[in-house]
Amino acid sequence: MKPISNQNYIPRGNLGARAGLLASRLEMREYRPETVLNMDQAGWPGDWEGRTILALVRMAETTKKEPAYLHEIVDIVLAARNERGYLGPIYDGTSDGGTNSGARVNEQQLSGHSWLLRGL
């Protein structure tokens, strides 16, 4: 089977209707700029933000419609980065008695940022 490029395809009929519903869902409160940074309560920095950006980008490619909040979300997420350029705490392997003492890396932080990189 030969795949169809979404550059040359605009979904119509049931598929178009479903794509429209999904695009509308991505404009709900939890995917808006004012809340997207607060949605991850499970300790996966970059995960919710990245999945949101990726979903908006892919939906725009499919529907050929500009997402309402994409650029604003990207701006907010990029502004929230720490001084090393990523979201969440800095793990530097030092032992200062804090919650990140001795940690060099956080698996959830790495995984969450993979979604963010794909979306950007």
Per-region residue spans from a language model:
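Low-complexity, Ser/Thr/Pro/Gly-enriched N-terminal "stalk/linker" regions
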Residues: 1-51, 55-58, 66-95
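Structural signature of alpha-solenoid helical repeat scaffolds
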Residues: 44, 107-108
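Residue signature of alpha-solenoid helical repeat architecture, marking inter-repeat boundaries
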Residues: 47, 111-114
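Residue-level signature of alpha-solenoid helical repeat scaffolds
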Residues: 54, 115-118
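Mid-sequence acidic-hydrophobic segments that form the walls
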Residues: 80, 119-120
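Acidic/His metal-coordination segments adjacent to aromatic residues that form catalytic metal sites
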Residues: 96-103
